[in-house]
Amino acid sequence: MGKVVIFDWGGVIMHKHPVDNNDRQAIIRTIRSFNPNLTDEEAWDVYTKTLIDENGIYISRQDDELSKIKWVDRINRVGNFNASVDEFSTRFIAEHLKVGYYKELVDFIHFLKDICQIGLFSDLIFCCAPVLDEQVDLSQFDYVWLSYITHLRKNTEEVFELVEKDVQVSPEDIMFIDDTTVNIENAKKRGWNTCQAFGYELDKIKDSIEKFIGYKLESESNGKKM
């Protein structure tokens, strides 16, 4: 079935703290829109302290309505405001649509579709899905693994097994691009090819993929060769 190139989202495609116009700033704006008395650090703490419930479950990364309600209720309680799931989701999406992303890399990813299979593999909450789709057009991807759907995070061996089961290729025919060391190390343990990079390191990403597929890539995008 050939080769598969798999991309992370945050940091690789979307701007991630401390890069300007990043996801953390969007989260802070979201929380403070419901309670403007919070400082930026307090707003960030509201978010980070409510991602996991008392049983250690990432309720923010579940797809069922009960988990969504439970998560937003926790945010309301810790942040001292009262937003519905729809209100919070709408604001979260609106603020994240303002976040920068690496458009040139997205163009390159779409170009790769004619050469190999492409996948997206990311830990994210349900509110992020519309933003992700707006940035990358999920219909262009052969595979999409999002933690709020798989209920597995990239720090678990099970999710890597799921990816391998879905793609049905040997580990040496998988290339994984991620900005986080632990995710890269987990992929290496499986025998995957890896490239640890941020989205602004397009040349590094391209070089790694060229070595992976075994030849030089050339295409036209916005008048520039890829």
Task: Pin down the residues of each PLM region.
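Asp-based, Mg2+/Mn2+-dependent phosphohydrolase catalytic module
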Residues: 1-7, 125-226
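Short, surface-exposed acidic
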Residues: 31-49, 77-91, 171, 215-222
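Acidic-and-aromatic substrate-binding clefts and catalytic sites of carbohydrate-active enzymes
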Residues: 19, 96-102, 152, 202
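A metal-dependent, Asp-based hydrolase signature
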Residues: 51-90
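Active-site neighborhood of HAD-like aspartate-dependent phosphohydrolases
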Residues: 1-49, 189-190, 201
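Substrate-recognition element of Asp-dependent hydrolases with the DxDx(T/V) motif
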Residues: 84-133
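A short acidic, glycine-rich active-site loop
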Residues: 32-35, 61, 146-150
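Alpha-helical elements of Rossmann-like donor-binding domains used by nucleotide-donor carbohydrate transfer enzymes
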Residues: 22-30, 46, 70-74, 91, ...
